Design a protein with these regions (language model features):
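Catalytic center-proximal scaffold of phosphoryl-transfer enzymes
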Residues: 1-44, 86-441
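Cys/His-rich short segments
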Residues: 55-107
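Short, intrinsically disordered, charge-biased short linear motifs at domain edges
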Residues: 42-50, 75-82
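Sterically constrained small-residue positions within well-ordered secondary structures
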Residues: 50, 66, 82, 181-183, ...
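Short glycine-rich, low-complexity/disordered patches
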Residues: 22-26, 45-61
């Protein structure tokens, strides 16, 4: 190995003496390739099973699998292509063979090492496309892989993360989760929102949408986050604790998502929180979930979402007069910001009487504010030092979901989208390293 590298260095220095120049980028890449090749050769030697194989090993069926010889398997590692040799055993009882070394090294049913699969999962979930992930693997790791390998590996690891999440959810439902011990948490927030992801046609059969043709083009990803707050800044504004935000989400029913979000909150120490806050927009499913899974929590409708209701109504009242639209919003937003919800509702209903052609739309908005009155007392929440905006989850929908799954020309299956979502939630919750540690356990 040292001889090949020494030869390469001699060639590089000879070329420099002749030309007086050095192409540093080319030298870097050449040396990396040589070092990887040398490392791959050494790793191949390490992966040749030297010790005598056992004549019999236990089989999962309860029988004994008999040694049938050594088998060679190609393996792509972070150092490049290698080969591993391991014992093969066959069970006559269940007619199944096994490579126990494959299981021990986490390379069962794959020719990609754990390190390579970790890299593929990272680029597959974080790059703008699986093809771009393939390009990154070649440039950054010096490894040639196919786009399909990036896609399949990302979906496989994502599906495994999602499966483990479901196991944890079942533990929570059966009250078998380990008790989250630790100090009391001053304030814990749960936020949730939904965002549509474009899907292939077979995932949309029988579903109606908001478009003019009534057909659905997306499926809703329900995303939740949990974070904590222990202090305010010098001006009294609440400050989210650094690195305290974790995410969970999937394309699933509201009932399934409620169990998911409950489990995440419990793992974060919901029962230790001195004040518990649930935040979201005005979607009915959010508040049904809050009352079912987080009874007694402070419920807050996102301030900017509530203001948006006024802007949308103003656009109907003054469709072509921008100045009048703004004046109308400012005169009514004052009541909202001051927590005078009853006055706001009365004002709106007076407008319903005056503008009969829009009475139904105005009454709908009046009912919205009346129904959510306890959730939009913003001066009260601010006095308590609480957040009144759900910017954390809205940013999560844009960055965690939108930036990867809502790009131009993308159409997903539910299975593929949920796998990528699982990986991205895991990574953005800083749990990706823990996941790979658990695979080695």
């Amino acid at each position: 190995m040292a001889r090949e590298i020494d030869t390469l260095l001699r060639v590089i220095f000879t070329a420099r003496r002749k030309t007086g120049a050095l192409d540093l980028e080319a030298v870097e890449m050449a040396l990396r390739a040589a070092l990887q090749q040398a490392g791959a050769a050494g790793l191949s030697q390490l992966l040749q099973q030297q010790f005598p194989a056992e004549s019999h090993v236990p089989c999962s069926c309860g029988g004994q699998a008999r040694y049938k010889g050594m088998r060679t398997k190609p393996l792509l590692t972070v150092l490049g292509r290698t080969e591993m040799q391991r014992a093969y055993h066959w069970c006559s009882r269940c007619q199944q063979g096994q490579f126990s070394t494959d299981a021990a090294l986490d390379v069962e049913n794959t020719e990609l090492s754990p390190g390579v699969r970790r890299m593929l999962t990272l680029v597959g979930s974080e790059c703008s496309s699986f093809e771009r992930g393939r390009e990154h693997m070649k440039l950054l790791a010096g490894l040639e892989v196919t786009t399909k390998a990036v896609e399949r590996t990302t979906e496989s690891i994502g599906a495994d993360i999602a499966r483990r999440e479901q196991d944890t959810i079942q533990q929570a439902l059966q009250q078998e989760l380990p008790v989250a011990v630790g100090q009391a948490i001053p304030v814990m927030y749960v936020q949730m929102d939904g965002t549509g992801v474009p899907m292939v046609s077979q995932e949309l059969e029988g579903r109606t949408g908001k478009g003019s043709n009534g057909r659905a083009h997306t499926r809703e990803v329900k995303l939740g986050c949990v974070f904590t707050q222990t202090k305010r800044d010098a001006e009294g504004w609440p400050v989210r604790d650094e690195d305290s935000t974790t995410y969970t989400g999937a394309i699933e029913t509201a009932e399934e998502f409620s169990r998911r979000l409950y489990t995440e909150a419990q793992q974060r120490g919901w029962d230790r929180a001195q004040r518990k806050v649930v935040m979201g927009d005005g979607a009915e499913w959010i508040w049904n979930l809050a009352q079912e899974q987080f009874p007694g929590a402070i419920e807050i409708v996102d301030l900017y979402h509530a203001r948006q209701h006024l802007w949308e109504l103003s656009s109907k009242l003054h469709p072509s007069d921008v100045a009048a639209k703004r004046r109308w919003v400012m005169s009514h937003q004052h009541f909202l910001d001051a927590g005078k919800i009853e006055l706001l509702v009365n004002r709106l209903r007076a407008w319903a009487t005056e503008r009969q052609e829009l009475a139904e739309e105005i009454e709908t908005e009046a009912n919205y504010f009346e129904r959510n009155a306890a959730r939009i007392r913003y001066p009260k929440f601010r006095q308590q030092g609480l957040f009144v905006g759900s910017g954390v989850i809205e940013a999560g929908c844009k960055t965690l979901i939108g930036s990867r799954l809502k790009r131009s020309g993308m159409f997903w299956t539910v299975r593929g989208a949920n796998a990528v979502i699982a990986v991205r939630c895991c990574r953005h919750s800083r749990e990706f390293d823990d996941y790979w540690e658990s695979r080695r356990a």
